[in-house]
């Protein structure tokens, strides 16, 4: 059964392709839900791929939506233990975890002061968005991008694994993730420009231009289009 521990904020897990036109309506809605105009962007997953450019792209994107971006200068574990940066996250109303390497992102965030602050902000009502690598990491189990098997994620959402870029992924990786899916877990394959949204009410929805493909060992595969609700409170496998 899908669980989100003590959730009181809004959670958006994106299948990739952040800050592009298909997400305009969703990102505008998330900004409004936050109750402010500031977005705290964490580029740590792109530490080896010009994280400064990630923040620049986000700044340009949210400016067009009436928002302003503050980049959180975190690229390694030492940064993630800084009290001043953790406080910025704890006080934020909208936190956006950018795409990149989920394994590097895990090494930065797992057990860190920064991750504790992010969770506290979310539990306090903040909007938390995570794209690609971030979406994968916030779940547990977590799809390992090196071969499609599973490893340990951060577990903000338990019992659910997210497979980003599902429609573009190599078939053998998708098939391996389905084959190795734990009996008590749900795999959500998210297409690019597609998001799994959990509202403060606890309801899950699929948003965006693509499809969410839902896999379980004990149920037929199903597809949910953007704009449709999604019941993730499925019974555990017997």
Predicted regions mapped to residue ranges:
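Short, flexible loop segments at the rims of nucleotide/cofactor-binding pockets, characterized by
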Residues: 16-20, 71-76, 104-108, 164-166
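A general structural motif
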Residues: 8, 36-39, 92, 125
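A conditional alpha-helix N-cap/helix-loop micro-motif detector
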Residues: 20-23, 78, 85, 111
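Class I SAM-dependent methyltransferase SAM-binding "motif I" and its flanking Rossmann-like core
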Residues: 98, 104-172
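General beta-strand structural signal in soluble alpha/beta enzymes
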Residues: 13, 70-72, 96-97, 128-131, ...
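Portal/gating segments that form or line small-molecule/metal binding sites
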Residues: 40, 46-100, 104
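C-terminal and late-domain segments of enzyme folds
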Residues: 1-36, 45, 49-56, 60-64, ...
């Amino acid at each position: 059964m899908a669980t989100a521990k003590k959730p009181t904020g809004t959670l958006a897990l994106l299948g990739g392709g952040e800050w592009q036109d298909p997400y305009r309506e969703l990102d505008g809605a998330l900004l409004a839900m936050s109750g402010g105009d500031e977005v705290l962007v964490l580029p740590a997953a792109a530490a080896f791929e010009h994280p400064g450019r990630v923040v620049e792209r986000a700044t340009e994107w949210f400016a067009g939506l009436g928002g302003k971006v503050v980049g959180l200068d975190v690229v390694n574990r030492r940064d993630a233990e800084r009290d001043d940066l953790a406080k910025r996250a704890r006080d934020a109303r909208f936190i956006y975890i950018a795409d990149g390497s989920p394994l590097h992102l895990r090494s930065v965030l797992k057990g860190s002061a920064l991750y504790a602050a992010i969770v506290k902000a979310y539990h306090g009502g903040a909007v938390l968005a995570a794209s690609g690598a971030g979406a994968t990491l916030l779940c547990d189990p977590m799809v390992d991008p090196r071969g499609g098997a599973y490893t340990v994620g951060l577990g903000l959402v338990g019992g659910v694994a997210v497979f980003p870029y599902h429609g573009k992924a190599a078939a053998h990786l998708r098939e391996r993730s389905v084959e190795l899916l734990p009996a008590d877990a749900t795999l959500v394959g998210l297409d690019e420009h597609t998001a799994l949204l959990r509202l403060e009410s606890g309801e899950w929805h699929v948003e965006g231009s693509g499809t969410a493909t839902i896999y379980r060992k004990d149920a037929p595969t199903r597809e949910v289009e953007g704009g449709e609700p999604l019941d993730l409170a499925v019974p555990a496998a017997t």
